[in-house]
Structures are given as C-alpha cells and as structure tokens.
Amino acid sequence: MMANETAAKSTKSSPTPAVEPESKLKILALHGYRQNGDGFKSKLGSFRKFIGKHAELVFVTAPHIAPPLPDSEAGTEPDPAQRSWWFNKDDGTFKGTNKNGPAIGFEDSLKLVEKVWKQEQCCGLLGFSQGACFVGLLCDLSARGMTSIKPEFAVLSSGFRSGSLVHLNCYETKVQIPSLHIYGEADEIIPKEMSMALADTFTDPQILTHPGGHFLPAQASQKQTYVEFFRERLQFHLEAQEIENATAANSILVDDSGPAGNGVHDDDDDDDDSD
C-alpha cells in the first residue's frame, strides 16, 4: 500500500512556478528615414532617461540603404548608415508627402520587425517620422490579424499616413489601443496636419505638441506626460501578466488533479505542464 502511494506521488508533477512579471515595458523603436538604430538611440538619450524607470527601448535598423542625397556629387556612394524602411517613389527614394507611389521593400522590413518583436518579447511600439508611419501601419495590420505583432500601445512622433497605393486601405478602421502622438507646431518636413491625420486613425489618441520642428522633444515640459503615459502602460501590462499567470496556474491545478481526481495522470500529459 505504501509503495503504491509513493508511486502515485512520484507520478504527480510538481506545480510549474509562476512566471515573474517583467518590471519594465519593452518597446520596439523604429527610426526615421536616413537614420539607423544606433543614431536614433543616441538622439533619444534624454527621452530614455525620462522613461527609464518604466520602459526599455529596443532599437532596430531598417534593412534598406537609402540612396545618396539629390545634391550629392556625381559618383557618390550610398552611406550604409542612412537607412529606410521602404521607398515610396519610383526613383527608389522616400518622401513623406508623396502620394500614390509604391512601397518598395516594405515586406522585407515587416519581416524584420516581426522577427525582432518576437525575439525581444516586446509589448509596445515607438516610431519617429517614417518609423512612426510604419508604427501606424503595424497597428492597423495587427488589428486586422495581418501581422504577428500585437502591440499593447504605440508612441508616434512626427508621424503621418502612408501615401503608398498598397497602404491606402489601412486606415479604414480606427485602432483601438492607447496611443501618444507627438508633433511640432513648426515642423516643415512633416506638417502638423499630417501628424494630426494619423492620430485621427486611433481611438482616443493622446496628443503632445511642442513649438519646435522635426524631432522628438525631451525637455522638462514634456517629462510629466511621458512618465505618466508609460507608468500607466506598465501598470496595465503587469496587471495583464498577473491575470495570465493566475490563469496558467489554475490550468496546471486542473491538469494535476487527473481524470479521476486522484493526483495521477498519464505520461502523455507531462508535456502539457510546460505550456
């Protein structure tokens, strides 16, 4: 009898420990046209300090090298440090205000960010200029189940709607996740009206304006907005993780009870304990 009891106990798997919740948000950061991940990280030094208690940024570099500037000397080689997520002009360049053009290389960039998103286990998106345009597209694609990226929130600085023909149907339904939209009143590269139009594709967008031009501001006057936004996002993220862990723990208890409720289950069930 004692041997049978011992055998029964040995076949019962020990409860899988709950996964410790992440203490910070992990956010995929997408740079602008003719930028790269390292340069974008350098530019956001003050911003990263503001949000460092609540969030960590994961920087990725676009896969496409931008061509030399139009006023470059003949024979100038492309600068590998100047990157683009896609090109929306037939000459293989990009301009935010261009309409009804192609989206050359977009699918390659989509595959890249999907890979990094999964590897880094990110939960939010941040983008600047072309990167913010990309973030807007990713949010829409996610809502329609057309990408593996599932952002909980998004931050878009100097963003705009893509004018590429293949993207024109991406803004028919409003995105239902929390979003912070940042733009400069004096932005001459992406006029504020374009950023406002992108913000209008989100439900209840939070707007932060500044008197400057084409950059993501990180001054004392913006700090409170950033801190409060990311603190709230972290709170919701941790609460969701707690619910997920509790659900997983309850599932394990149900599995451990066995089909007859005697704490014994078949060998085939052991693999399920790791889910």
From Swiss-Prot:
Residues 7-16 have a biased composition (Polar residues). Transmembrane segments: none annotated. SUPFAM superfamilies: alpha/beta-Hydrolases. The keyword Transmembrane does not apply. GO terms for biological process: response to retinoic acid. Its EC number is 3.1.2.-. Pfam families: FSH1. The active site is at S129, D187, H214. InterPro entries: AB_hydrolase_fold, FSH-like_dom, LovG. Keywords: Hydrolase. The keyword Cytoplasm does not apply. Belongs to the LovG family. This is Esterase AAEL000016. It comes from Aedes aegypti. The lineage of its organism: Eukaryota, Metazoa, Ecdysozoa, Arthropoda, Hexapoda.
